[in-house]
Structure formats: structure tokens, C-alpha cells
């Protein structure tokens, strides 16, 4: 199999909970664990913000970051204990090319000046990439930092599957998102666009994936789009069911099936998946992880976050010798920021709060049944 460009490394400085944290990634599957608040989703969004191509509604990385983190102020993304003038910087390497974006925490504006590229009119619109959102009023009230993007690196369109199901919430969502303020982040909007866009042709071809058929078979029918209503349906031999009436776990399966059918997950692309286990019965996890591994074997780089032992163990059990899987553990540290450890061997991942908790359950069950600890010590 040819080697496709992939995300090789990442460094987060003063980015939300990260003070100065570095990652070295696998070209295959990158599984990320950590307790709540350790920054797993923030890590994915930091990469996606650069990876995501600009669009009419989200023209630059400044707008992308604010919509990904649902904030009007970029300074909210800067680590909270930094001082004015401190630098938020995200750097990475993709296909042996370096890229970066950065922002300063600025003092509160006192003259109403917006941020631009030197050609702005104080409106906050600016014309340079990475400045403003075109919605400033000259007050500078929400422009206490600005983001500058450099090292333009061409990347394949990424896919971000949020933990929140969106397959059942398609009716009118995109229109509403563009016309009123909705409290949904940009990943929810983006994935609906990919659900609705037709298949495209890519120079790298598509992913031949037998597990895709197995996932489709789990649904028991075909995913059908109704353009007039803006809704998806599951069409079976007995009729069709509105997606909101389909079980959420099956809608998650349907999301992956739809993305593959639309040819968005192709060799050389990147899949970011935030907690794939949400609303999914463990009985479905074997086929799901089989599909994830199949994608990685055909050149799709995968980043997934999880709180599930089943996800981790399925990756461990199903991996072939040639599979490239790396496990990351994030550990929150209020003073030094979130720290990371990584390994290619699931059994040696430390710290591993998921495995520790399952081990604790076993110990408690053993004590309840026998009155002794795992070492044979009498507890009662």
C-alpha cells in the first residue's frame, strides 16, 4: 500500500488545558483516553481547525476556532493562567511539511480598533486570512486576540464525527445555523454538509471495505435522503422510517455508512471521531472497530477519543502485526497543563484510568464474593 501524507506530530502551547504538550502520531489509528476535562476533544479540534478547508461561511481559521469552541473571543481558547501578551501556538507536521497558527492574548482594546491585515477599516472585518469574522462593529469588544495561520499545507478534506448524533437532526439545521445563532459547534454543521453532498471523485480512489457492507447490513436497509424535507430515512423491505425514530446507536452506524458511501473517507484523508461508543451497544463494537481498522489499512488516518474499555480492547484484539496503532493517555495537571504518555502496546499504557476502574470493579466483586482481596488477604 502506498504511503499517504499524514499528521506526524503536533505541539500545543497555551491552548485551553495544554501548557506545552507534544504528540507523535501513527499513520494508522490514534486512540486517545483521559479523564473528563483532560482535553481530548480540544486536541481533535485543534487539528481539525487547521485541517478544515475555508468556506464562505467560515472563511479563515479565526472563525473556525471560534465556531468550534462556541466562543466570540479567541482569548477564551488561550490557557486561562497566561498573562496578556502570552502566545497561543499550535504547530504540526503533515507529510513532512510544517504548519502553524498562533494568537496573542491582547489587552482590552481601548480605541475600538478591529483586527485586520493593515487594510481594514476598524470594522473588525480585515482582509487577511485568520483575522476577524466580518461581523465586527468597531468596538473591539470581542476582539481581544487574533489568530494568524502560516505554513499553508494542502490536506485532504477531513471528517469530524462529533459525539452528538446528527443523522437524526438534519431537518432545517443547516439553514438555521447560517441564519441564527445556534448553540451547536461547527463539527455538527460540517458533518451535515458531508451527509448531503454527493460522492466525489478523488485521485486516490475509494476504500474497498468489506466491513462497510457489514455495517450497512446491521442497519437492515438503505439510507435515503429526502431533499424536499431535508431528512434522512432508513428504507427497509417493510417501508421507510424517519431517522429520528431509528435508535441513536444505529444512527451512529448510519453516519459512518453514509460518509463512506459519499466517498469522504478515502486514502489520504483524516477521520476525527469523538467517542464512537456513545449510545452504541457493546455488541456492535466489534464490527465498528473492524471498519475503523479497515479504513486505516487503506490509508485513512484515524483519531478517536474514548472512555470505553471495549473500544480499546477491540483495537488490541483485532490488530494485525502490520497495523499501526498508537494509544495516548492524557492526564490533567492544573500547574503544568495536561500531560501525555503514549505507547503502541495497549497493555503498557500508563496512566490508564479506564483499565484501573475495571480492575477496581473486579477487586470489589472478588471481595464481595470471597471476603478476600486479589492477593488472598482477608477483608472481612
Task: Enumerate the predicted regions with their spans.
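Conserved hydrophobic alpha-helix in the ABC-type ATPase nucleotide-binding domain
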Residues: 287-288
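Phosphate-coordinating catalytic segments in nucleotide- and nucleic-acid-processing enzymes
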Residues: 1-11, 50-269, 333-380
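Phosphate-binding P-loop
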Residues: 21-27, 263-266, 294
Amino acid at each position: 500500500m502506498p504511503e499517504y501524507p499524514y499528521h506526524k506530530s503536533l505541539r500545543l502551547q497555551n491552548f485551553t488545558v495544554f501548557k506545552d504538550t507534544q504528540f507523535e502520531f501513527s499513520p494508522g489509528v490514534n486512540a486517545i483516553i483521559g479523564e473528563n476535562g483532560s482535553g481530548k476533544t480540544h486536541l481533535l479540534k485543534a487539528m481539525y481547525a487547521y485541517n478544515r478547508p475555508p468556506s464562505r461561511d467560515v472563511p479563515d481559521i479565526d472563525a473556525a476556532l471560534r465556531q468550534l469552541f462556541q466562543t466570540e473571543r479567541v482569548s477564551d481558547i488561550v490557557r486561562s493562567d497566561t498573562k496578556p501578551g502570552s502566545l497561543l501556538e499550535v504547530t504540526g507536521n503533515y507529510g513532512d511539511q510544517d504548519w502553524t497558527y498562533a494568537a496573542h492574548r491582547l489587552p482590552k482594546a481601548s480605541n475600538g480598533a478591529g483586527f485586520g491585515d493593515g487594510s481594514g477599516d476598524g470594522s473588525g472585518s480585515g482582509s487577511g486570512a485568520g483575522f476577524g469574522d466580518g461581523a465586527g462593529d468597531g468596538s473591539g469588544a470581542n476582539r481581544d486576540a487574533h489568530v494568524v495561520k502560516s505554513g499553508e499545507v494542502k490536506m485532504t478534506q477531513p471528517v469530524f464525527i462529533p459525539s452528538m448524533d446528527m443523522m437524526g437532526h438534519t431537518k432545517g439545521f443547516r439553514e438555521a445555523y447560517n441564519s441564527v445563532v445556534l448553540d451547536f459547534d461547527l463539527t455538527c454543521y460540517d458533518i451535515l454538509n458531508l451527509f448531503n453532498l454527493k460522492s466525489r471523485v478523488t485521485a486516490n480512489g475509494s476504500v474497498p471495505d468489506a466491513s462497510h457492507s457489514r455495517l450497512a447490513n446491521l442497519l437492515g436497509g438503505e439510507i435515503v435522503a429526502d431533499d424536499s424535507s431535508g431528512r434522512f430515512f432508513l428504507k427497509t423491505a417493510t417501508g421507510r422510517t424517519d431517522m429520528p425514530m431509528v435508535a441513536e446507536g444505529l444512527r451512529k452506524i448510519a453516519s459512518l455508512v453514509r460518509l463512506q458511501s459519499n466517498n469522504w473517507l478515502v486514502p489520504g484523508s483524516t477521520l476525527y471521531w469523538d467517542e464512537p461508543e456513545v449510545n452504541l451497544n457493546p455488541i456492535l463494537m466489534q464490527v465498528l472497530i473492524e471498519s475503523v481498522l479497515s479504513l486505516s489499512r487503506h490509508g485513512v488516518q484515524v483519531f478517536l477519543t474514548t472512555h470505553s474499555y471495549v473500544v480499546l480492547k477491540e483495537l488490541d484484539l483485532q490488530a494485525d502485526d502490520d497495523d499501526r496503532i498508537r494509544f495516548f493517555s492524557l492526564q490533567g495537571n492544573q500547574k503544568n497543563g495536561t500531560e501525555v504518555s503514549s505507547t503502541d502496546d495497549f497493555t503498557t499504557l500508563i496512566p490508564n484510568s479506564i483499565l484501573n476502574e475495571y480492575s477496581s470493579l473486579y477487586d470489589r466483586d472478588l471481595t464481595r464474593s470471597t471476603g478476600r482481596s486479589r492477593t488472598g488477604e482477608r477483608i472481612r
